[in-house]
Amino acid sequence: MNRSYSKESLSEIAGGDEDFMGVVAQTFLEEIPPDLAALQEAIDNDNKELAYQFAHKMKPNLEMFGIDVQKDVAAIENWTKSSKPNSAIEENITRLVSVLEVVFKELEEDFK
């Protein structure tokens, strides 16, 4: 079954330990949703400094799970250093949220 995250990448990091993979997945599910909400709020409020902090904080976790959103996170980070309005990254944050909502469901199914 195709997933929006890489179970192989997670398994490699966990040394194939299913229990540890479950712990890592649970930690991801506890930390990333509130960080994503805070990122969205920072973008909505045009708080570029805070948006950068949350995007940067989330990036290693997204990479660890092999979630293909690096371009969107990079676009958000680049926006924080620009004078562009938040509408310039509307597509990026929308795609990031959509992909992560799917990943959250998949992780909940895979690591009940």
Q: Each predicted region: which residue ranges?
A:
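Extended low-complexity intrinsically disordered regions
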Residues: 1-5, 9-13
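Amphipathic, coiled-coil-like alpha-helical segments
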Residues: 2-4, 24, 28-30, 61-75, ...
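Short, charged, low-complexity loops and linkers
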Residues: 10-22, 52-55
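Flexible interhelical turns and helix-capping residues at alpha-helix boundaries
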Residues: 14, 18, 32, 43, ...
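Short helix-adjacent coil turns
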Residues: 16, 39, 43-51, 80-87
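An anion-binding catalytic pocket shared by soluble metabolic enzymes
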Residues: 58
